[in-house]
Amino acid sequence: MLGDSVTTDHISPAGNIKKDSPAGRYLQEQGVEPKDFNSYGSRRGNHEVMMRGTFANIRIKNEMLGGEEGGNTIHVPSGEKLAIYDAAMRYQQEHTPLVIIAGKEYGTGSSRDWAAKGTNLLGVKAVIAESFERIHRSNLVGMGVLPLQFVDGQTRQSLNLTGHEVISIRGLSDGIQPHEILEVDVKGPNGVASHFNVLCRIDTLNEVEYFKAGGILHYVLRNLIAG
């Protein structure tokens, strides 16, 4: 659960790797000394490091933790505080797909491809935000992550979303269309159910095909295999 102006550097930092971060722990397990960690940017060819670095920026604020800075979150339903990577891996073991909820201008800043790649590798299937930066929106679709936009002036605050809800998105199996209005079902931790509408920010028919294939790389490979 993120706020406004979440940048691609918040999502996929390029700075130094902390010793006690998921990426730092991984490198030490591979026999790399902390003095040789270097930066995320220098290791962008290593998906194991980069996926562990996704949402690991020390300045990112997760509203599930009251706006506390750092790449942590709350695992639902256990309530355990974990690094975002560690929580994502637990959710994958539990076969739970993930949704990010955010405010305005999601994905601003430099066009960093790992911001979308890492999001996909963590098991995120959709991002619901008030607005998206143009290139990052396109990159999300290209990685098979669905960008959805609040409508009718609604926000995470007006809908009283906390990040502890179970989110279900209707209509995805029916053949999604550009700029389609989709319905989101919400079940709160107290069992109370509600719903709201979102605008599908898949903007073109080509993007529909990329998304249906699971991303642009899958789309290209399937076309090559098909002849």
Regions found by a protein language model. Give the residues of each.
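Fe-S-dependent hydro-lyases/dehydratases of central metabolism
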Residues: 1-227
